[in-house]
UniProtKB/Swiss-Prot annotation:
Full protein name: Large ribosomal subunit protein mL43
Pfam families assigned to the protein according to its UniProt record, in alphabetical order: L51_S25_CI-B8
Principal location class: mitochondrion
Source organism per UniProt: Eremothecium gossypii (strain ATCC 10895 / CBS 109.51 / FGSC 9923 / NRRL Y-1056) (Yeast)
PANTHER family: 39S RIBOSOMAL PROTEIN L43, LARGE RIBOSOMAL SUBUNIT PROTEIN ML43
GO biological process: cell redox homeostasis; mitochondrial genome maintenance; mitochondrial translation
Subcellular location: Mitochondrion
Family designation: Belongs to the mitochondrion-specific ribosomal protein mL43 family.
Quaternary structure (record): Component of the mitochondrial large ribosomal subunit. Mature mitochondrial ribosomes consist of a small (37S) and a large (54S) subunit. The 37S subunit contains at least 33 different proteins and 1 molecule of RNA (15S). The 54S subunit contains at least 45 different proteins and 1 molecule of RNA (21S).
GO CC terms of this entry: mitochondrial large ribosomal subunit
Keywords, in A-Z order: Mitochondrion, Ribonucleoprotein, Ribosomal protein
One function term, GO molecular function aspect: structural constituent of ribosome
Amino acid sequence: MVVKALRQISVGQNGVGAFIFPCKKITLQYCNWGGSSQGLRDFLTSKRLAKWAEKYPQIQFEVVAKAGHPVLKAEYINGLNKAICVRNLNVDHVELKLKLLRESSGAQLRHYPKNANVLSLNQSVRGVWSPLHVDPALRHRV
């Protein structure tokens, strides 16, 4: 009997085996002509990007010259993307936004209700409690 192997690509998950950096690619998009891109152009010419690339080899950096306002775009291992407009920001603020994208997990921001302690995809085993489902003889009388 011949055994056939399954052809699947393993999906990287943090906490299973090793730590995987959530951010996999950062694209720096700027305009050569526009004044709003001056901070990002200064960031690129000051060799700070080269230091970032040496410090974080697991992140792929891509520089794109395109008309319009400057944008930093990040791609994450969970398939989501984030984009931050850095128009009219100086070099230090551009680096802060780059750091924000690097440290982010890529997950969408959510509002959690005050008493939602457990998030689950499954229903409760006991069901939802309601005083109307109790036998009327056992209900508390005021």
